[in-house]
């Protein structure tokens, strides 16, 4: 996992304070894996005070059992707290946990620490704050007398595969990470041939026959850590990854999903009545689509019960309608069922919210999806996509924002390939700052009008619904305090929401006590800086010339920031204009002075054209960025006593006007709101399922 999100844990102890776990000898089918206590790795790369000597994963597909062994050395005292606690998660609805060994190796001796009565069984809902409950259990044991230099060696088996897959096995394994590992071993035993695929130089397995079974073994030793780079796209598979799957095609995954999403009962009277009310109240097909979408998004609250097959199989539309909650697959099936009852073609569709185009390189399997949405085809044949888990969306049915998931697999018999999805949204943000400056050296009044479109409007609408006006006002004040000293809000932000057009406007008003600041290294000079902060917050300058990974861009994205300054006196300002066109973005800058009203107008605009910069294009892009970095802002300056500028002499002659400054660096960076999706992705990676 490239990003580990910090989660709040709701912990419920079951069966009292202590509970006995099952124990047994190591299964006879497991092959002992040797490892070195002194691997050839750079110990300066270690983090958190531990060295993982062995990561061993062996799976017997016929017995539906996974054997895990972890061997970790404690390097210093700081690691004892974490290394001395063993946690193993499993799903009790279809899995059984059995521990085999827990040993501490110290000075050539082995200390047996497997005491079944010392275990605690906990129910830890790691994603409860995001309304996801997977029912998993955690067996936890705290080891006594752990010391620096100890090697902790433990192993266990988890018996049972999720029955939803009906014996079709698939999984993924990583062979590196952000800390070095002495040895990584993956071994699979199967009575049928397996499809496998490795990424980034992962070698082919060692193949063997053992007791009539196909044996596949992958081993990596002295594993060096990955190099972390900021803004590496989530879809970029830059690590050694192994995929294994028994599914022979994406069509077979579709057939699996059709059976899992099959509606085995007619719609209930209550649900049918609700659909009939929608039909009676509307005549237009688009209105009906909109009504159903609004109902599923706003009236069916998001909550997922993911135990066992619940991670993949939706509840029936009748149950979801009655209980008024569901996760992504529940909401999607309900929405599709309601639309079909209205004679509108609709299907649930599986997506991966982060893999995007990389999903095309994966082996077919349902475990590589983490989300479910809806595809709708109107009577004219036009296609629309909707995410029923998003709330507070604006826009008509034809212009509802759909995230850039890129590819989706429609759950419809006969489908053999992905739908390619192009976002219709521009996600424009328009900000207009108006400064009215008092006399020179004094304060100013700042009025800000921000207009949000598409996904940006959806996000702001949800933000205003989830926060009090007082809290928002304080947060806005705190934000502008980064730019101006002693700034106070004059009134609460004023919200105007055109839901149908999905256009949300916010007006703010502030008083700045002292907007002028002394210029650095310039005696008797004061200045005012004007920064397009809506763009400034998006951007940063590359600090390296070359990269190993692509750079994520905020896409689709269009930001316009206009600044109007009412000056307290005449200024000698020259108009300027500049534009930059790049294959990944367009940039426009314009400065205009209107002398008869002493008004300065600044225009900054940037529009992304791609969602990333390739490694090959990075150097060229970096040069463009550095050329622009001195133009993202404007400063005016004068003497501290307000004397005539035309009479003030500098070393370079008469000081007359303002200058462009390097207020911030420039590059478009990704700012995707995950709301709850990050947590959903973490849950998916941990155990599988659609959220």
Task: Label the predicted regions.
Residues 679-691:
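Cytoplasmic C-terminal tails of single-pass
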Residues 1-6:
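Bacterial N-terminal signal peptides that target proteins for export
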Residues 14-15, 47, 686-687:
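Intrinsically disordered, low-complexity segments enriched in small/polar residues
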Residues 7-15:
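Bacterial N-terminal signal peptides
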Residues 8, 37-39, 679:
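Compositionally biased regions
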